[in-house]
UniProtKB/Swiss-Prot annotation:
This is Small ribosomal subunit protein uS12. The lineage of its organism: Bacteria, Bacillati, Actinomycetota, Actinomycetes, Mycobacteriales. Residues 1-31 are annotated as: Disordered. Residues 9-18 have a biased composition (Basic residues). CDD domains: Ribosomal_S12. It holds the Pfam family Ribosom_S12_S23. Gene3D superfamilies: Nucleic acid-binding proteins. The keyword Lipid biosynthesis does not apply. With S4 and S5 plays an important role in translational accuracy. Interacts with and stabilizes bases of the 16S rRNA that are involved in tRNA selection in the A site and with the mRNA backbone. Located at the interface of the 30S and 50S subunits, it traverses the body of the 30S subunit contacting proteins on the other side and probably holding the rRNA structure together. The combined cluster of proteins S8, S12 and S17 appears to hold together the shoulder and platform of the 30S subunit. Belongs to the universal ribosomal protein uS12 family.
C-alpha cells in the first residue's frame, strides 16, 4: 500500500478498457482493401468452410473479416466496407464485411432479412 507522499508524487492510474474492434479506431465502419480471400474451418463442434477475407483498413491495420451470406464476388484488391462484430466459431475474426456496399454485391435471391445482406426488394 502506497504512502500518502507516494500518492501525492505519482497518483493512481486507472486501467483503460480494452476495445473489441481496435482496427476501426472508434468509427462505426471503415473502408479497406482485400489482401487475401480464403475459407477456413470453425471451432470444434461445428463443421463448415467459412468465407473470410484479410483486409487492410484505411487506419493502416490489417484484420480478418467474415463474409456473410451465400456466395460472394470478392477477390484480391476489392474495396470493402467493414463493421465490427465477431464470429463466435472463428478465432481471431472480429469484423464483418457489409454486403451491398462498395465492391461487395448483395446476396442474390435473398427474401428475408434483406437489409443485412444488401439485397434489393424485387431481385
Amino acid at each position: 500500500m502506497p504512502t500518502i507522499q507516494q500518492l501525492v508524487r505519482k497518483g493512481r492510474h486507472s486501467k483503460k478498457a480494452k476495445v473489441a474492434t481496435a482496427g476501426l479506431k472508434g468509427s462505426p465502419q471503415r473502408r479497406g482493401v482485400c489482401t487475401r480471400v480464403y475459407t477456413t474451418t470453425p471451432k470444434k463442434p461445428n463443421s463448415a468452410l467459412r468465407k473470410v477475407a484479410r483486409v487492410r483498413l484505411t487506419s493502416g491495420i490489417e484484420v480478418s473479416a467474415y463474409i456473410p451470406g451465400e456466395g460472394h464476388n470478392l477477390q484480391e484488391h476489392s474495396m470493402v466496407l467493414v463493421r465490427g462484430g465477431r464470429v463466435k466459431d472463428l478465432p481471431g475474426v472480429r469484423y464483418k464485411i457489409i454486403r451491398g456496399a462498395l465492391d461487395t454485391q448483395g446476396v442474390k435471391d435473398r427474401k428475408q432479412a434483406r437489409s443485412r445482406y444488401g439485397a434489393k426488394k424485387g431481385q
